[in-house]
């Protein structure tokens, strides 16, 4: 007896079972779900997979998103604790890990999260060997290095969200002072996503006008306008938000969706993201930190050779040393 579906639909050819732009988010905590909703709202993927170890929450988050399918352009949302659900992902976003506590440095998190990654990363690569991995968990620069080592993937397919958000905060805060929109205020935060980040004051501009040329003391202790405080606000902002609401999630979620849009649409936009910088700016160790990088469908394809002043290069090297001093003590990075 024919079913209602048989009566309604005449099949012409079997549908495709392999997704074109599948994205996986590992970890359905506050950050993971902010990433998920930001990705969905931008309509970046045709399939979204969620993975976590907490099954009830995972199923609940999946159902909640599925119930909004009418309002989305992503027709398939799936979830499971088994990583087979992630198969054929173009990009895997890793947000899982121990949450940063109030007053805790990102670098203090490292060894606790390494052990989590030793389970996650081999599973991701097993099911999506051609994927690009975007690491979001903190401390992001060190965990991007850990992911690179555990995954065996080439360095252009292991990217850390890095200073994409720091630079967004920097541009927002400067734009607030100048009374313009953040997109019209250009500036870069490089180095560690954290306390030793580097504000590139020499490159800050509005409409191509160098602000440091107009105020040579900009970013220094001698600056009468105290622009250096803007960078301090960037560094302190995550700690402040955590103190006020317990965690950060919305801005990093939007930042991740911004990166994914560039990758999945092959836009070749330049972002400050974490990459392997050995051999650049006099850095001799295998560390990951943020430089201006071109992203596209192949991953991180090139690095912009930004002209930095001597003091900025010194700060970048200090950032690399800060990361290496923690990284060199990480135990057993075999998957």
UniProtKB/Swiss-Prot annotation:
Q: Where does substrate bind?
A: 106, 138, 169, 248
| CDD domains assigned | LDH_1
Spell out the reaction equation it catalyses: (S)-lactate + NAD(+) = pyruvate + NADH + H(+)
EC number annotated for this UniProt entry: 1.1.1.27
Its subcellular locations are:
Cytoplasm
Residues that bind NAD(+): 29-57, 99, 138
Q: Which Pfam families match?
A: Ldh_1_C, Ldh_1_N
Q: What EC class is this?
A: oxidoreductase
- Cite the InterPro entries for this sequence: L-lactate/malate_DH, L-lactate_DH, L-lactate_DH_AS, Lactate/malate_DH_C, Lactate/malate_DH_N, Lactate_DH/Glyco_Ohase_4_C, NAD(P)-bd_dom_sf
UniProt gene name: LDHB
- Gene3D superfamilies xrefs: Lactate dehydrogenase/glycoside hydrolase, family 4, C-terminal (3.90.110.10), NAD(P)-binding Rossmann-like Domain (3.40.50.720)
Q: Where is the active site?
A: 193 (proton acceptor)
Any one GO MF term held by the record is: L-lactate dehydrogenase activity
Where would you say this protein principally sits, based on its record? cytoplasm
Protein's name according to its UniProt entry: L-lactate dehydrogenase B chain
Function comment: Interconverts simultaneously and stereospecifically pyruvate and lactate with concomitant interconversion of NADH and NAD(+).
**Native organism:** Sceloporus undulatus (Eastern fence lizard)
* Keywords, alphabetical: Cytoplasm, NAD, Oxidoreductase
Q: Name a GO CC annotation attached to this entry.
A: cytoplasm
